[in-house]
Amino acid sequence: MDNYTYSELLKSLQNKCDNIALIIKPEKIKQELERIEKEQEDPNFWQDVLKARDTNKEKVRLNRLLETYQKTKNSLDESVELFELAQNDNDETTLSLLYEEAPTLEHSVQKVEIEIMLSGENDASNAIITIQPGAGGTESQDWASILYRMYLRWAERRGFKSEILDYQDGEEAGIKGVAFIIKGENAYGYLKNENGVHRLVRISPFDANAKRHTSFASVQISPELDDDIDIEIDEKDVRYDYYRASGAGGQHVNKTESAVRITHFPTGIVVQCQNDRSQHKNKASALKMLKSKLYELELEKQQSSAKNEEKSEIGWGHQIRSYVLAPYQQVKDARSNIAYSNVEAILDGDIDAILEGVLIAKA
């Protein structure tokens, strides 16, 4: 990097920071935080528990956004000042240090941009994830289990919690399907763009001839809805099936028909849960999954209508990302059009760069 390149980078980052300020309006955030603090001082604040909870959530979000913005702006202003002084004094040591820190400065501005992008209605929610293997038997079932582990490892890296709702072992390896919740700040906001088909190309560990195989798995993401969001489901539109649990989460198998499957006829959505020994609890969890999927479906329809587009199909034709392990190693996302070479780390849950790249591409 040279003086001109760094100077242009600073101009670009300053422009982005100015645009961010126009969007988030820091002074208005400060005023809103003052208003919330006064509201919290009211002795009657906790009488409406749901409202109080939402207010606290908003306070945390605004504080985090303001703190991230101010920290980034201060770092940028300091870098601009140091750069001018170093240029005037021909201070090569300081210039070299600034060049080295440029990627960190650039990433900090990007972090504020991501914070803004995660301010949607459901972005702060927990995420319900369903993974289904495509055609191909053991190959696809194994690929589905690899994706499942990838998301669990991502959650662990962030300190998020996870909870299995439904898990079906594959016949030889992998899984026939899994549904689980990732619980953490902005879990849905980060993962919402994972909806679609994930493609794997590799030398099959199940093929004695060591041939290259292509496998597919479908990932569906929906927000875990708060209890105060009411989604009405007509009983005549659904069918409940009860069966004996099997696989992980259902080690008490073949004793009681505690597992629950719900089919929603108007949409064709099928959800199932076998995580708990209690049929009642499994039914409640399955209903929560169904309501979340119906809510997500309605949001997609509204967004498509607003853009005057047809609803994008989340099916086997909607491929969002390819993971190639042979003959070369590369993960490429179809939305951001960015390719990544750290395939092993990605499959171990290091997917922040991919998720953020898609958020920025779709902004």
Swiss-Prot record:
Positions of post-translational N5-methylglutamine modification: Q251
One GO cellular component, as annotated: cytoplasm
Keywords: Cytoplasm, Methylation, Protein biosynthesis
Pfam families, A to Z: PCRF, RF-1
Compartment annotation: Cytoplasm
InterPro entries: PCRF, Pep_chain_release_fac_I, Pep_chain_release_fac_I_sf, PrfB
Origin: domain of life: Bacteria
GO molecular function, one term: translation release factor activity, codon specific
Post-translational modification: Methylated by PrmC. Methylation increases the termination efficiency of RF2.
Family annotation (SMART domains): PCRF (SM00937)
Protein family membership: Belongs to the prokaryotic/mitochondrial release factor family.
Annotated function: Peptide chain release factor 2 directs the termination of translation in response to the peptide chain termination codons UGA and UAA.
Name this protein carries in UniProt: Peptide chain release factor 2
Origin species: Helicobacter pylori (strain G27)
Recorded name of the encoding gene: prfB
